[in-house]
From Swiss-Prot:
Gene3D superfamilies: F0F1 ATP synthase delta/epsilon subunit, N-terminal
Subcellular location: Mitochondrion; Mitochondrion inner membrane
A GO term from the CC aspect: mitochondrial inner membrane
Gene Ontology molecular-function annotations: proton-transporting ATP synthase activity, rotational mechanism
HAMAP family: ATP_synth_epsil_bac
Keyword field contains Lipid biosynthesis: no
Name of this chain's protein: ATP synthase subunit delta, mitochondrial
Subunit structure, interactors included: F-type ATPases have 2 components, F(1) - the catalytic core - and F(o) - the membrane proton channel. F(1) has five subunits: alpha(3), beta(3), gamma(1), delta(1), epsilon(1), plus the additional subunit P18 (Tb427.05.1710) that is not present in F(1)F(o) ATP synthase from metazoa. Subunit P18 (Tb927.5.1710) interacts with the alpha subunit with a 1:1 stoichiometry; the interaction is direct. Subunit gamma is part of the central stalk. F(o) has three main subunits: a, b and c.
Length: 182
């Protein structure tokens, strides 16, 4: 499979590589039997709505939904993403994700991690491991689970088990913080 894919990719991109270096596009996207030039610095300033796709593993929660903006928290801080935002890929922390619709309503989700792919042509794809509406989470249950995981941390037998429990604790603490500020 990879041999034929690699051969097709090379055969499609070979003409680009043989041309003068200044003729190479800055970015390109491989599609079946064609190469499409992409300008990652193209100005897209007159966009009215951001097209948001929000996925959880293999399930769509939102599919190219027109929204005013989305707020995500990444490893480098919080990002407010509006139409025409610069191209960026953001690694998400366990935190709330806020979606503001064009009619002014908002929905808050909790994401356990993932990536946000912000495209400068007015779309944003947020791919998460787990994502749920913040209203569906219960603070009392989260606090009970935190106590149970802290007890399990003391009884962890090896480093692997301890690491798994520490990850659970950090996500549950993020859920509790999000629920307290909601």
């Amino acid at each position: 499979m990879f041999r034929t894919f690699g051969r097709r990719l090379v055969s499609c991109t070979l003409p680009l590589l043989q041309s003068a270096p200044h003729d190479l596009p800055e970015g390109f996207e491989f599609m079946e039997h064609k190469v499409v030039n992409k300008d990652i610095h193209a100005p897209h300033e007159n966009l009215e709505x951001l097209r948001l796709t929000l996925t959880r593993q293999d399930e769509f929660l939102l599919r190219e939904e027109p929204v005013k903006c989305v707020t995500v928290t990444g490893t480098n801080g919080e990002y407010g993403i509006y139409p025409g935002h610069a191209y960026k890929i953001v690694q998400l922390n366990p935190s709330p994700l806020t979606v503001e619709y064009t009619d002014g309503t908002t929905k808050k989700y909790f994401v356990s991690g993932g990536f946000a792919h912000i495209n400068n042509e007015g779309s944003c794809d947020v791919n998460t491991v787990e994502c749920t509406l913040l209203d569906d989470l219960d603070l009392a249950i989260a606090e009970k689970e935190l106590a149970a995981q802290q007890a399990a941390l003391g009884s962890a037998k090896d480093d692997k088990a301890k690491s798994v429990v520490e990850i659970r604790i950090s996500v549950i603490e993020a859920v509790i913080a999000a629920l307290k500020h909601h």
